[in-house]
Amino acid sequence: MWGSDRLAGAGGGGAAVTVAFTNARDCFLHLPRRLVAQLHLLQNQAIEVVWSHQPAFLSWVEGRHFSDQGENVAEINRQVGQKLGLSNGGQVFLKPCSHVVSCQQVEVEPLSADDWEILELHAVSLEQHLLDQIRIVFPKAIFPVWVDQQTYIFIQIVALIPAASYGRLETDTKLLIQPKTRRAKENTFSKADAEYKKLHSYGRDQKGMMKELQTKQLQSNTVGITESNENESEIPVDSSSVASLWTMIGSIFSFQSEKKQETSWGLTEINAFKNMQSKVVPLDNIFRVCKSQPPSIYNASATSVFHKHCAIHVFPWDQEYFDVEPSFTVTYGKLVKLLSPKQQQSKTKQNVLSPEKEKQMSEPLDQKKIRSDHNEEDEKACVLQVVWNGLEELNNAIKYTKNVEVLHLGKVWIPDDLRKRLNIEMHAVVRITPVEVTPKIPRSLKLQPRENLPKDISEEDIKTVFYSWLQQSTTTMLPLVISEEEFIKLETKDGLKEFSLSIVHSWEKEKDKNIFLLSPNLLQKTTIQVLLDPMVKEENSEEIDFILPFLKLSSLGGVNSLGVSSLEHITHSLLGRPLSRQLMSLVAGLRNGALLLTGGKGSGKSTLAKAICKEAFDKLDAHVERVDCKALRGKRLENIQKTLEVAFSEAVWMQPSVVLLDDLDLIAGLPAVPEHEHSPDAVQSQRLAHALNDMIKEFISMGSLVALIATSQSQQSLHPLLVSAQGVHIFQCVQHIQPPNQEQRCEILCNVIKNKLDCDINKFTDLDLQHVAKETGGFVARDFTVLVDRAIHSRLSRQSISTREKLVLTTLDFQKALRGFLPASLRSVNLHKPRDLGWDKIGGLHEVRQILMDTIQLPAKYPELFANLPIRQRTGILLYGPPGTGKTLLAGVIARESRMNFISVKGPELLSKYIGASEQAVRDIFIRAQAAKPCILFFDEFESIAPRRGHDNTGVTDRVVNQLLTQLDGVEGLQGVYVLAATSRPDLIDPALLRPGRLDKCVYCPPPDQVSRLEILNVLSDSLPLADDVDLQHVASVTDSFTGADLKALLYNAQLEALHGMLLSSGLQDGSSSSDSDLSLSSMVFLNHSSGSDDSAGDGECGLDQSLVSLEMSEILPDESKFNMYRLYFGSSYESELGNGTSSDLSSQCLSAPSSMTQDLPGVPGKDQLFSQPPVLRTASQEGCQELTQEQRDQLRADISIIKGRYRSQSGEDESMNQPGPIKTRLAISQSHLMTALGHTRPSISEDDWKNFAELYESFQNPKRRKNQSGTMFRPGQKVTLA
């Protein structure tokens, strides 16, 4: 309560204002914000209004539509201003009052008899909202008071207690109202009718503020009336009206009247029951069960009966709880549950109905059919009290929707105990019908507990508790209605216990559909039988309420903004807010469009959709129907269509509802490739898309409050009929889940740990989430779920933990979990793993390397730092230069150094003869790159897929170029994807691709000079055995016009020369050159493992393996120790096929030698049969030998070489070389070998070609110079290409 000491000293000075009359429904003075600050006004402070008449005292509020400029204007209600004597536009002086007295009691008087009668009918509304209309009062003042939106009365302030010039109404102020009755009219209502008349208008007992209706100058023997002024003249008052009024008040507050006379036992309760049934209420209508509680449930002790198990609360659809709450009315009715379409279908299957009946049950349901089909449900009806909130709105809804098909008239709230006992699930549909049976008075009751009671409790204790409960729950005018058996909860020593309250009949005929009344008065002549032994309680294991096992939006991470915007769309579609109901009532439900959530596999689109449904279920009280389309894939079209129809019918039945079609693209999507357009699955998807489109059209025409959410991998993966811009726009809100960035990955990881372990993440002191998020680039939501499981497994494998609370994860656990883990988004992406090469394995190209590091490597290493740059980062680089200068090698090295995923695309492999397939291939490759980001997308031979537009007769490359332009510089842009392109003919590329924002950085890879050639030779020969006389400086000086690829070929030829020289020096007989060459090929590892001349600037793995250089012929033939190696490759059955031959026999049949090695090896006796036979292959699945083609022989030789190298490295043959034994000749490359090889090797690019490339690149770098040299002149108006 505001005390006068708090307001002491508040305010100061005054201000002259202009009075403006308004239609506000209150007695406040509305002041602008500037004037409030000027007068230093406090809340609930009084203001003195001074003008030519007697000053007035008013309360103030701050106006919301005043402008900051202009004169001071004070707005006031027109009726208030006129009663005070103010004029519209007049000048008054406002002065803040420093002291305000809180009134303990205020005497008021209606201004006329009409005001008194209106006050009697709307006493509750006045009590509830009086403080919202007036706070400051003063004697002899007349104020208007609004009892509803259109009706107001005038009251005059008679006196204030304590006496003061003005005072403030508080919540505990007693309001004494003097009646103003008509003299010549007598009230002829009976006592019961008078009580009933007042009871139905009673609204809510507001805490603290209690209204006392008193009269002056009444007879001294009237109960409950006090005399306040004996000297005043006697006012004629209708004594019967006042007496009935006070009897009503005594009944409401459970006051026991001293003189209650009844003509017959129970007649009063029966008459009250009949009077309630005579009210005009919308009985025999259909309502939807909701979980939101109406205003009437919050009433105090006077209406505590409404809290009990026997009352339900009905209110209209658009009831606003924060607005003025309407008064409620109490009646009795029968409640029966109606079966939903899904329940009817289940019942049909159980009853094995005829085909005609089954067809009838599957037809759409309307309100008339519902009423006729459920007459048999009357036997299961329950009679109870019905509390009607907003009765006027419900009656208006019946009038306005008389010619419109409306399923539900309003909403009904049923207490959980009563709802579960009646087997009514949430959001079910019930029908309330009038009670046509006259109630009876029970003569005997039986109370029996449904659970064990304390041993020291007695029957009298149970009776006492039951009598107390009945007194608090019922009154004479509001008796309790029970059927044959009810379940109630009584307060015992051990808390609330459930009891069975049943009627004891004297004969069996009384059990036919009777209802009974109970009240404290009737209980005096009713016998109560108490049984202390608990009755057998039937265990009902089935849960009738539909529980959504979904996560909330707050439990997800990385999709907060996306979830909020999606929930906003669903909220507006279901008219979940007042603004939506005012502005979007014509486009509610599916008319507002469906929501489509797209994202890659494992991105969390289904989890997000379920979380949105969970929020709609909790906040909007919406029913949720989920259809898992993945489970419907492969079924017949009729079954899928029937499942969708049942789901939508169930949603309409329980509206407002949300229908979730999870993975819709699996049953109504496009084929993966154009070749499958006429496959059976594609035809079924098309038919299903048509059926779903027609179904949605039908429900849109019905105007139902149903929202639709669908998930798919992309908008393009759905059938075009569902996402078409023409016809019905089904999906008007599309939300795409992007791959998470580092901050979002940290949020997702934190929430996954919380959901898994149900603990506080702050207790994991040794867990660095930022570090784990940085190491999980390219991960999506599902990957984090698996990663946390792997981390938990790693923790449990290191330490035995008994409870979940003791489980503490660390960064080490996640590091172990990341080993060998491939994210789901990368499993379907064909990534290319670059070779294990670093910058130290590249010779020359220093400037190019620095550009790549600044553009790609540093932003990938420090993303937070580069994210703060105000300019857009470059994401596209074109590498151009002559063949063999190391362009492809640079792409692989930068991918390895930056630790990003690498996707390599050869130009021609994107082109297709089908229309649209090439563009789709370009889109797919960028989608793969987005899924694998951070990623480097490398286009080799770029000129083959992006030539100048207009030069292709088919138009395929033109469409590819257009698609590349869209992907490289689209509206959404590339995030985390760098595009590298390599070409030797940049002049052939469409210039539009080389403009800023696309491949805006063109880097020239020049041919190596002498210094660069020396670096390349050092890198390539790093693992080769070189003799001491080798002078690479001299080799670099005499290799002009050699590229990196040419230098690699030079070392390769020098290696062959060294091999030939070693064979000759070993005393071998002269043989053909092809034999020697073939032998060397079988004993060497090639410098260039993969084809492609651009990988030539350096290669650290291309050296000759020392373990394979030894020329001892015992290594060529497999001995017994290496027998298992051949079994590993050729299969386990080759031994049985060859018999128990020796190793030489096995070698002669299984060893795969070079195809050219068909002659005798010189100096190797006894081995003639070894290489004379053609290579064959024996496997476990085939009998006999299989002839190999040339390609299969080459592949077989390469695989055997790899197996030999791995086997020898594991068996430690290198170490065995140092053991005592025969001395093996070592291979070494000398200067003579290099010079001899140089004589046989020539550059791959001639001098004329070098000149052409030089002119070409010069003109590409300086386009103006090219135009000047060409001398081309353009005439005005001449048509030229913009390319």
UniProtKB/Swiss-Prot annotation:
Biological process, per Gene Ontology: microtubule-based peroxisome localization; peroxisome organization; protein import into peroxisome matrix; protein import into peroxisome matrix, receptor recycling; protein targeting to peroxisome; protein unfolding
Record-annotated residues binding ATP?
599-606, 881-888
**In the UniProt record, does the keyword Cytoplasm occur?**
yes
What catalytic activity is recorded? Answer: ATP + H2O = ADP + phosphate + H(+)
Coiled coil residues, start to end: none
Q: Residue ranges under compositional bias (Basic and acidic residues)?
A: 355-367
Q: Which effect does the record note for changing residue 662 to N?
A: In B1 mutant; abolished ATP hydrolysis; decreased interaction with PEX6; decreased localization to peroxisomal membranes
Mutating residue 843 to D: what's the consequence? In PBD1A, PBD1B and PBD-CG1
Q: Which UniProt keywords apply?
A: Amelogenesis imperfecta, ATP-binding, Cytoplasm, Deafness, Disease variant, Hydrolase, Membrane, Nucleotide-binding, Peroxisome, Peroxisome biogenesis, Peroxisome biogenesis disorder, Phosphoprotein, Protein transport, Repeat, Transport, Zellweger syndrome
Which EC number(s) does UniProt give?
Answer: 3.6.4.-
**GO MF entries:** ATP binding; ATP hydrolysis activity; protein transporter activity; protein-containing complex binding; ubiquitin-modified protein reader activity
Q: Carries keyword ATP-binding?
A: yes
* GO CC terms in record: cytoplasm; cytosol; extracellular exosome; peroxisomal membrane; peroxisome
For the region Disordered, give the residue spans: 346-367, 1260-1283
Identify which top EC class this enzyme belongs to: hydrolase
Function, please? Component of the PEX1-PEX6 AAA ATPase complex, a protein dislocase complex that mediates the ATP-dependent extraction of the PEX5 receptor from peroxisomal membranes, an essential step for PEX5 recycling. Specifically recognizes PEX5 monoubiquitinated at 'Cys-11', and pulls it out of the peroxisome lumen through the PEX2-PEX10-PEX12 retrotranslocation channel. Extraction by the PEX1-PEX6 AAA ATPase complex is accompanied by unfolding of the TPR repeats and release of bound cargo from PEX5.
The record's annotation in PANTHER family points to: AAA-FAMILY ATPASE (PTHR23077), PEROXISOMAL ATPASE PEX1 (PTHR23077:SF12)
The record's comment on protein family reads: Belongs to the AAA ATPase family.
Record note on quaternary structure: Homooligomer; homooligomerizes in the cytosol, interaction with PEX6 promotes dissociation of the homooligomer. Interacts with PEX6; forming the PEX1-PEX6 AAA ATPase complex, which is composed of a heterohexamer formed by a trimer of PEX1-PEX6 dimers. Interacts indirectly with PEX26, via its interaction with PEX6.
Identify this protein by name. Answer: Peroxisomal ATPase PEX1
- What phylogenetic lineage does the species belong to? Eukaryota, Metazoa, Chordata, Craniata, Vertebrata
